[in-house]
Amino acid sequence: MEHSTPLNEEIVHKKNDENWVIAQKKVFTNWCNIFLNQRSQKIEDLETDLYDGILLGSLLEILSGKNVILSKCKQLKTRLHYINNLNFSLKFIGDEGLRLVGVASEDITDGNLKLILGLVWTLILRYQIQSMQNSKSSQQNLHSSTKPSELMLNWVKSQISDYGHHIKDLTTSFQNGLLFCALVHKLVPEKLDYKSLSESDSLGNLTLAFEVANKELGIPSILDPHDIITTPDELSILTYISLFPKVYQQTLEPLNNNNNISPSLSSSSSSLLNTPNKRNSIQLSKSTSFEQQNQQQQQQNLLSPNSYRNSISFSKSPSFEGSQSTGSSRSISPISSPIKNSTTGNSNLSKSTSFEKIEASNTTNNNTIIIAEESRVIEKIVEKIIEVEKIVEVEKIVEVEKIVEVEKIVEVEKIVKVDDIEKLTNLQDQLTEQQQQYQEKSLKLVNLELELQEKSNQLVDKSNQLSTMQATNSELMEKIGGLMNDLTDIPTQDIKEKDEIIANLKIESEKNLKCFQDDFNALQSRYSLTIEQTSQLQDRIKQLINELQERDDKFIEFTNSSNQSLADNQRVIDQLTNEKQSITLQLQDQQDIKEKEFQFEKQQLLSQIDSITTNIQEYQDKFNNLQQEFNTQQTLNQQETHRLTQQLYQINTDYNEKQTQLQSEIKDNQTINEQLNKQLSEKDKEIEKLSNQQEQQQDEKINNLLLEIKEKDCLIERINQQLLENIDLNSKYQQLLLEFENFKLNSSKEKENQLNELQSKQDERFNQLNDEKLEKEKQLQSIEDEFNQYKQQQLSSNSNIDQQLQSTIIELSELKEQKELNDSKLIEKEKQLQQLQQEFDQLNEKNQKDHQDQLELLEKQLKQLQQEYDQLNETNQSIENQLNQQNLINKENLNEKEQELLKLQNQLNQQIEKIQFDQQEFSKQNSINIELVNEKNEKLIQLQQDYDQLKQQNRSNDEKDENDLIEKENQLKSIQNELNQLIEKNESDHKEQQLKQQSIENDLIEKENQIQQLQSQLNEQRQQQSNQLSEKDQQLNQLIEKNQFDQKEQQLKQQSIENDLFEKENQIQQLQSQLNEQRQQQSNQLSEKDQQLNQLIEKNESDQKEQQLKQQSIENDLIEKENQIQQLQLQLNEQRQLQSEVSIDNDKILELEKQLKQCQSDLLKLNDEKQQQDKQLQDKQIEFDQLQLTFNQFKNDKDSQFIQLQDDQKQQLQSIQQDLNQLKQENQEKEKQLSEKDEKLQSIQFENQEKEKQLSEKDEKLQSIQQNLNQLNDENQEKVKQFSEKDEKLQSIQQDLNQLKQENQEKEKQLSEKDEKLQSIQQDLNQLNDDQIKKNEKLKEKEEQLLKLQQDFNDQQSQQLKQLEEKLSEKENQLQQLKQENEINQLNQQQQSNEIIQQLKDQLLKQQQQEQQENNNEKEIERLIQEIEQLKQQQEIDQSELSNKEIKIQTTQQEFDQLSHNRSKDQLHLQQLQQELDQLKQSFDDQDHQFKKVIDERYNLQLQLEQSTLSNNQLDQLLKEKLKPLELDSNEKQKTIDDLLSNISNLQISLQNDKDLISERNNSIKTLESRITQQLSLLDEKDNLIKDLQQQKQQQQQPPTASSSPSSSPSLLSSTPTPKPQRPNQIEIDRLVNEIVNRNQDLIRKNKTKFYKLENGDYIVNSIIYRLSLDDDNDSDLIAQEYENGNSTTFEKSLRIFPSKNTRPIFDWRALFFIGAAVLAISTLFSSSRPIKYEKPT
C-alpha cells in the first residue's frame, strides 16, 4: 500500500503550486517595499495594491532614477485612468529595453497574481541581478556560467569555499540555514558562533542568519524561514542572495581591488558591434530575439514552478551569445576586388566560406586561359566536389539527429540531477574550443586556396576554348551559390551546433583539396608554355568583370529601394495594429466590468435563495410548535369539561330548592321582559343596518384591491411569456451574428483599400452605437418618469387612506367622551342602588318567589354555555385547518419559486455551455488557419526548390557563351524579383490572415460582451421582478393595515352598541326602582307582619351563607376559565406572528412583481435594440451597394489602364522594329567594309558594342512587357475571385430566407403552447369556482355562530342582573362586596367576548378578500383570452404577408439563378480565353528565345572577326588551331571566310522573318484584347442587373433610408442643403470658370471628371464642393463658426475651399476617399493665373 493514487498526486501538485505562489508573493512584496520605503510608501498585498499604477510608477522611478512616470499619472478613481497609468509604466519598461510578454495593464488591475509576479521578477533581474554582473566581486567566476541561478551559485561557492559545504542547487541546499549563516559569518564572525550550529535545527539557523544580516549588515529579512523549510522556492532564495554582493563589495573592497578580472562579457559584445557586414547585423538581430525568447520563457513559466526554474537555470546572457555570434559573422567580410584579395592575405579573411570560393575562382578564371583538354579534368573535379557535398549533407543530417538525441538526454538529466549542469558548462567550453580550432583550420584552407589560385594563374588556354572554360566556371559559381543558399537557409539559432559539423566537413574537404593540388601541379607543368598568348585576352576579361560589377551595384541599389518601401509599409501596418490593440483593450475593459457585475448579481441571487430556504425551515419549525401547543390545549379543554359537569350537578340540586321561591317573581318579570324585548328588537334592527352598510363599504374596497392584485399577476404571466420569447430571440440573434461573421470573413478577402474604407465605416458605426446608447438612456429616463408617476399615484392613494384614518381617530375620541359620560351616570346609579337596599328588606318575601325563576334561567344559561363551548371548539378546529391549508399553500408557492430559480440557473448554465462551445469552434478555426499558413510555407519551400532546379537546368543549358551567361543572369534577377514578389505576397497573405484572425477574435469578444450584456439584462430583470414583488408585498401590508383600521372602527362601533345596551340596562333598573316603590306601599300595609319576617330573616341568613359558599365555588371556576382564556390569547398572538411572517412573504412576492415589471421594460429595450440592429443590417446592405459602385469604378479605371498599357506596348514594339531595321542597315554596311578593308573592322567593333547595349536594353523592355502581361492575368484572377465572393453573399441571403421560415414555424409552435396554457387556465378557473362555493358555505356557518354568541351574551347579562337582585336581600356590607366582584367579572367577560368577536370578524374579512381575489383572477383570465385571440388574428395576418414575401423572394431567386448560370458560362469563357493567351505567350517566349540565340551567334561571329582583325599573324594562328585536324590550305581559308559571311547574311534574313512573326503576334493580341473588352462589357451589364435586383429586395424588405452615398449625377443635388440666393459677384465667377473649363477640356475628359453647378453658386467636382468668390464674403465666416460649434450636418464628407483670409479652410479626412481621379482636373481648374481667390487644403 505504499503506492499513491493519481488523485492524491494531483492534490499534492495543486498544493505545491499554491505554496510556491504564496512564497514568491511574500518575497516580492518585501523586495518592493525595500525601495518604496524611501518615499514612505508600502505594498500590503501585491495582488491588489498595483491596480491604479501609482505604486508601480514610483517603484520604477526609484529603481531607474528617472522621475518621468508619476508626472503623467492621474489619481482618479475610474478603471480607464488606472489602465492609462499602468500603460505609462509598461511603456517605460519597454523603453528601458525590457520586454513583457502576456502582461497587460488589465491583468494588473484585475489582480492576475502570476503575471504580476513575472513582472516583478523581470525588474529583479534587470535592476538587481544584472547590475551585480558589472560589479568587481561578481565577475570572478563568470567565464563558465552566465545564467542568473548559476551565477549566484558560483558566487556563493567562491565565497564559502572554506566552510566545506557541497552546494547543489538554490532550493534544498539552503533548507538547513547553514549556508545563510556562513555568508553572514564571513562578514561578521564576532556576531555569530558558526561552530555551535547544527543541521537539525534548520528553523533556528534561518532565523538567526536573517536577524543578524538585518541588524549588522542592513540586509532586510525578505524570506520566511517556514516557507524555506516547507517549500523552498528558487526565485525567492535567489532574490535574497542577490542582496549580499553589494555588502561584500563594500566590506571586502581592498581585497578585490588586487584581483585583475578579465572582461570576458564586454569583449564579445564589442566584437559584435564592430563587424560591418550584413551577416553580422542578422546575427545581432537574432541574438536579441534569443534574449526576448528567454524573457518570454521566464514570464510564462511562472505558471508552474518546475518549468519556471528550468527556464531560469538554462537561459543565456546576451554577452555569451555575442561571443558566439562573432564567430559566424567573421565569415562574411566584404571583398572589394579579386586583385586585393590575393594581396591582403590572411588578415582580411577570418573564416573561409563558399562565397569566397566563388570570387576566388572568378579571379583565377579571369587571369588565366585553360586549354580545352584540361577542361575535362576540371569537370571531373567538379563532379567529385558535388559528390563530396552530397556526402557532407548526409553526414550533416546524421550529426544533427545525433545532436537532437543528445539534447533530449541532456534535458532528461537536467530534471533528474542538478550536478549535470556543470557537465553542460564543460560542453559549452569544448564547443568554444572547437570553434577556435575551426577558425584556425578555415585560415589554413584559405591559404591553400590562395596557393591554388597562384598556381591556376599560371595555366593558359588557347583563344578557341575560352568560352567553354568560362561556361564551366559559371556552372561552378552557380552550384556553389546554391550551397550558399542552403547554408543561409540553416536557422541562426542552430549555427552554434552546426559549426562543429562544418569543421569536421572542412577537414575532409582538405584531404580532397590535397588530391586536387596534385592534379593542378601536373596541369602547371603542361601549360607553362601558353602563358604569353593569354596576355592579350586579359584586358577583355577585365572589362567584362567591370561591367558585371556595375550591374551588381545597380541591383544592390534596387534592393535597397525595395527594402525602404517595405519598411514604410511595415510602419503603416504597425500603426494600424496599435490602433486595433487600443480598441481591443477598451473592449476587454468593458468585458471585465460586465463579468464582475454578472458575478455580483449571481452571488446576490444565491444569497436570496439561501435566505428563502432558511425562512421555509423556520416556518416549518413554528408550525410544528403550534401543533404541539394545540394538542396541549385539547387536553386542558377535556379537564375543564369534567369540572363543568360537576358544577352542573351541584347547580341542579340548588335549582330544585329555589324553584318555590322564584315562582312569584317570574310573573312580575314577564311583563317587564316583554317591554324590554320590544325595545331590544328595534335597536337590533338599527344595528344590523349599520353593520350591513359597513360591510358593503369594506367589500368594495377589498374588491378593488383584489382587482389590482389580479392585474399584476396577469402582468407577471405576460412577462414570463416574453422572457421565453426573448430567449428564442437571443438564440436567433446569435445565429445572425454567426452569419454576419461569415460575411465579414468573405469581405475581408478583398483588397487593402477596401479594408481601409471598411475601417472608416466602422468608426462611423461606433458613433452610431454611441447614438443608440444615448437613445437607450433616454428610453430609460422615460421609463423612470413613468415609474415616478406611478409612485405619485400611490402616494395620493396613501394620503387618502391617511385622511380616512384621521377621521376614524376623531370618531374614537368622540366614543371615549361618551364612555366618560356613561361612567358618571353609573356612579349616580350606584347611589340610587344604595337607597334601594333599604327598601329591599321589605321585599324579601317576594324575592323568594323570584329566586325560583332565576334558578330556571341559570339552568338555561349553563346549557347555552355548553353549546358555546362546543362551538368554540369547532371554530378552533376550523381555524387550525385553515392555518394548515395556508401553510401548505405557502410551501407550494415556495417550491414553485425554487423551481423557477432552478430553471433560471439551468438557462444560465446552458448559455455558458454555448459560449464554451463557441470558443472551441473558434479554436478549431484558428488551428485550421494555422494549418493553411503552414501549407503556404511548404509551398514557398517547394517554390524555392523548384527555383534551385531551374538554376541547375539553366546552368546545364548555358555552357556555350559569355553572352548566354549575361542574359541568364538577367533572367535570374527577374526570377529573384518574382520570388521577392511572391514572398511579399505571401507575407501580405499572412498579414491578412492575422488581420482576419484578429477580426474573428474581436467578433468573438463582441459576442462574449453581448452574451454578458444579455446575462446582465436578465439579472436586472430578476432584480426588477424582486422589486415588483416587494412593492406588491408593501401594497398587501397597506391593505392589511387598512383592514386592521377598519376592524378597530368596527370594534369602536361595537363598543358604542354595548354602551347603548348598558343604558338599556339602566333603564331596566329604573323600572325596577319604580316597582320597589310600589312594593314600599305594600310594605306599609304589611308592617303588622314584622315578627313573621324576622323569623324569615333568620332563615334567609342561613340560606345566604350557603349561597356565598356556592358563589365562591363559581368564582373559582371563573378564575380558572380566565386562565384558560389567557392561554388562548397567547396562542392567538402566536398565530398573529405567523400572519406577520406571511405578510413578509407577501412583501417578497411584491418585490418579485417589481422585478417582472423591470423585465417588461428590459424586453421593450431589447425590442428597440433589435430594431436598431435591423437598421444596422440595412446600413450594411447600403454599404454593400456602395462597395459595388466603387468596384465598378475600379474596374473602369483598370480597363483604361489596360488600354494605355496596350498602346505603350505597341509603341515599344514599333520602336523595336525600327531599331532592328537600323541594325540591318548597319550590318550591311559592315559587310561591305569587311570585304573592302581589314582596318575598318576596329571601328565596326566599337559600333557593334554600342548596339549590343541597345539590344540588351530592348530585351529588358521586353521582359517588362511580359511582367505587365502577368500582372494583367493576376488582375483577371482577382476579378474572378470577386465574382465568387458575390455568389457566396447570395448564398448567405438564401440562408437568411430559410431562417425566416424556421422562425415562422417556431412562432406557430409557441401559439400552440399558448393554447394549451389557456386550457390549463380554464381548468384552474373551474377549480377556483368550486373553492369559492365551499368558502361561501363556511362564511354562512360562521355568521350563524356569531349571532348565537351575541344572544348568549345578552342572556348572560340578564342572568347576572337576577343574581344581583338576589344578593340585595342580604345585608348592606355583603351587597357592596358582591357588587364590586360582579362588576369586575362583567368587565372581564365583556373583554373576552369582544376579543373572540374580533377574531371571527378578521377571519371573515380574510375570506372575503380571497373571494375578491378569485373574482379578479377570473376577470384577468378573460382579458388574457381576448388578447390571445387578437394575437392569433395578428399572426394570421403576418402569415399571409410572409407567404406573399416568399413568393416574391422565389421569383427573385429564380432570376438570380439565371444570372448566376450566365455568369458561370462567362467565367468558363474567360478561362478559355486565358488559356489561349497563355499559349500565345508561350509561343512568343519561344520565338524570343530563338531570336536571342540568333543574336548570340551573330555576336560570337563578330567576336571572332574582331580577333582576326588584331593582326594577320594572330588570325592565321587562330585559323591553324581551328583547322589543325583538317590541315586546310590557303584556298580553303578563303572558303571558310566566305562561309562566315554567308552565315551573317542568313542571320539578317532570319531577323526579318522574326519581325514579321512579331507583327503577326501583335495582331493576334489585339484581337484577343477586343474579345476581352466585349466580355467585360457583358459582365458589367450583368452586374448592373444584379444591383437592380438587390435594390428591389431592399425596397421590399426595408424602408428607404435617408442617407445617400456621394455620387456624381445631378439628381443627388436634391439631397443637398436648401439653396441660398446667389452672391453679387456670381456672374464674373461663372464667366471665369467657364473659360478655365474650355481651356482644359482634354484633361477633364482623360480624367473623367464630373462637374456640376448648384443653385446657390457652389461647384461640385467629383462629389467635392467648392465655393468661390472674388470679394471677402461673410458666408464663409458663418460656415466656419457653424462647423466649429458642431453644426456641421450639411457639410460632412466634403472639402470646402473658402476665399477670406481670416477664416480657416474646413477639411474632413473622409473626403480624401472620394477625391479619386479628380485631383488633376481640380489642379488645372484652380491653378490658372485668373484672379480667383481660394485656399487649397493642407
Swiss-Prot record:
InterPro entries: Actinin_actin-bd_CS, CH_dom, CH_dom_sf. Residues 285-350, 1068-1090, 1589-1627 are annotated as: Disordered. The gene is abpD. Residues 373-1598 form a coiled coil. It comes from Dictyostelium discoideum. The keyword Acyltransferase does not apply. GO terms for cellular component: cell projection; centrosome; cortical actin cytoskeleton; endoplasmic reticulum membrane; Golgi cisterna membrane; nuclear envelope; nuclear membrane; nuclear outer membrane-endoplasmic reticulum membrane network. One of its GO terms (molecular function) is actin filament binding. This is Interaptin. Belongs to the alpha-actinin family.
